[in-house]
Structures are given as structure tokens and as C-alpha cells.
Amino acid sequence: MACGKTESGDDSGRFGRTGAGMFGFIMPGFVGIFRLSFFLLLSFAMASGSSSPASVPVSVAASVPDTTVNKIVISDGSEAHNINEFYDVKCHSHFYGLSVSSFASIWMMVNAIVFICAFGVFMRHWCYKAFTSDTAKGY
């Protein structure tokens, strides 16, 4: 028995892994992929926006009372934008709408797809390597 393998049943010789098998390795990868795909779909839906008009229309009064002459009137930001206002300190970035067809958004989507594919290839290689090492361990 000095040269034989001790069978203690605690799976201490399995490269530090527990005896749970492949489930502990595969399942977090799938959960991560599902969460990432849900996040990307949600981001794409939010970025595409809605084409319906605002729920509360902005009305312009024909005559302005004297009490509101020097006050700032807040609008919903649906009118045309002046590009020079973008560099103004008082500019609010949420007035400028997102475009899904812009170069930056397309570049981000391509990067996300590349990272998802790379993660899938990595997980496939890692799980296959763990599967073959577990299968060949008994022989």
C-alpha cells in the first residue's frame, strides 16, 4: 500500500476542485452569457428609443406675461439643436439623442460580439479540457 493511491473519498486529488463534477464549471459560464445577452438587448432597446411623441406636448403661448420675461423656460428638447451649444457649460448631454447607426454604437456592438464569441471559445476549450482530464483520470 505504500505505492498505491489512497481512496479517501474527499476528492483532494482533483486539482483543488470539489466533487461536484462539471456543473460548477459550466453553469456560471451559461449564467454569465445569459446575463450579458440580456444586458446587451436591454441596452440596444434603450438606445433605439421610441418614435412616439412626448406624452406632454410643449405649448407656446401667444403672449408672455411680464412676470416670466427673464425666466428660463424648460422644454422637452425635441426642437432642433444648435451644435455650438454642445460646448457650452450649460449644455445638458441628455438633450442630444443617441443614434444606433452612428460609428461609435456600431463599434461598441462589434466589440461586444467579439468578446462574447471569444468568451464562448474560451469556455468551450476550458470545459473540454476539464472534461477530458476528468474522463482520462480513471484510466
From Swiss-Prot:
Keywords: Disulfide bond, Host Golgi apparatus, Host membrane, Membrane, Transmembrane, Transmembrane helix, Viral envelope protein, Virion. Residues 122-139 are intravirion. Residues 1-100 are virion surface. It holds the Pfam family Herpes_UL73. It comes from the Viruses. This is Envelope glycoprotein N. Interacts (via N-terminus) with gM (via N-terminus). The gM-gN heterodimer forms the gCII complex. One of its GO terms (cellular component) is host cell Golgi apparatus. Belongs to the herpesviridae glycoprotein N family. InterPro entries: Herpes_glycoprotein_N_domain (IPR005211), HSV_GN (IPR034707). Its main location: virion. The keyword Disulfide bond applies. It is a single-pass type I membrane protein. The chain crosses the membrane at residues 101-121. It is found in: Virion membrane; Host membrane; Host Golgi apparatus, Host trans-Golgi network. Envelope glycoprotein necessary for proper maturation of gM and modulation of its membrane fusion activity. Also plays a critical role in virion morphogenesis.
